[in-house]
Amino acid sequence: GVVMYTTSSITATLGFPKDMWIGRSFIDFLHPKDANTFASQITNGLAIPKIVNDTQEKAQIFGTQGSTMVCRIRRYRGLSSGFGVKDTSVSYMPFLLKFRFRNISDDKGLVVYLVIQTVPFFSAYKTPNEILTQEVSFIMRHSANGNLEYIDPDCVPYLGYIPQDITNRNALVLYHPGDLPFLQEVYQAIVKEGSVTRSKSYRMVTQNGHFIKVETEWSAFINPWSRKLEFVNGKYYIIEGPANPDVFESPDPEKTPKLTEERKNQAQICRDDIIRIMNEVLTNPAEIAKQQMSKRCQELALFMEILQEEQPKAEEEFHLQTQDVDHTYYERDSVMLGGISPHHEYNDIKSSAETSLS
């Protein structure tokens, strides 16, 4: 889609002259990694049908609530970087995009426009190793094989990651290698008990390569049919910020801690053990689900047995009641409504009809 209008805040935020975007494609200003995600979300919204009065009509795109996503938008290359030198390198800034389609009438008739509101993200930390005084949390979910399935967009200013960059990657890589033995015990408790109350603090890596400290409340979903763990949910409470407070800064290999090959191998062994635990350990929730399923089957079998025993008696009683009811209502109808009865003579029928009409 071609940009038709921008607000003046684009200059203060990204450095572009106000009208520089006019007539150009919005996707051209997005980070290459985010362009496909943006286009896919818009396309999916356009493809959603709406059923009204049993007929399929064109959907009101994204409903009344609109839709959101996180992506990076390019900064203006002409921004001055000091001493009259202009930075010609391409840089991007993360934003939360809120967008919806609107139908607008103009000289060409009814035209559909995409309206996008952008909210910039800034690092939530001001100082190195900042201790957070207010409670801040985000949600993350991964499958039994460790693949990250969902991460809360609220985590962006605290971790620095764009959600689509780390989705479908190994979530266990986010944990500090030195804390993996402790987390291995935590995961054993998760799969055995189904949940774990708020854990003690451990470290999680941010986008810039430094670590924050978090405490987590864990819960697991056990499939009642397969009795296997499907996924693990975690609510992560941030306790302490990273040594480098700018989580959006590119990682510096010289400043980030390096691991020896031995430490890397030990960390990978721990991750493999955690995945094995999630897929092999027999869990208490699974046993409970198995017992509940067995109990329900027994109750259903008992109910069907009782129902079959009572069916002949019930049919006999129903037959007798039906005969009495039919006879009673048959006589009552002929008297109250003046209905035609084969037991009455024609004169009686005429008299009854005249009486009911008067």
From Swiss-Prot:
SMART domains, per database record: PAS
An MF annotation (GO) of this entry: transcription corepressor binding
Subcellular location: Nucleus
Keyword S-adenosyl-L-methionine attached: no
Broad class of where this protein is predominantly found: nucleus
Key words, A-Z: Biological rhythms, Nucleus, Phosphoprotein, Repeat
PTM info: Phosphorylated with a circadian rhythmicity.
PROSITE patterns hit by this protein: PAS
The keyword Metal-binding is annotated on this UniProt entry: no
Alphabetized Pfam families for the sequence: PAS_11
Described purpose of this protein according to its UniProt entry: Involved in the generation of biological rhythms. The biological cycle depends on the rhythmic formation and nuclear localization of the tim-per complex. Light induces the degradation of tim, which promotes elimination of per. Nuclear activity of the heterodimer coordinatively regulates per and tim transcription negative feedback loop. Behaves as a negative element in circadian transcriptional loop. Does not appear to bind DNA, suggesting indirect transcriptional inhibition.
Subunit architecture: Forms a heterodimer with timeless (TIM); the complex then translocates into the nucleus.
The protein, known as: Period circadian protein
Organism annotation: Hyalophora cecropia (Cecropia moth)
Lineage of the species this protein comes from: Eukaryota, Metazoa, Ecdysozoa, Arthropoda, Hexapoda
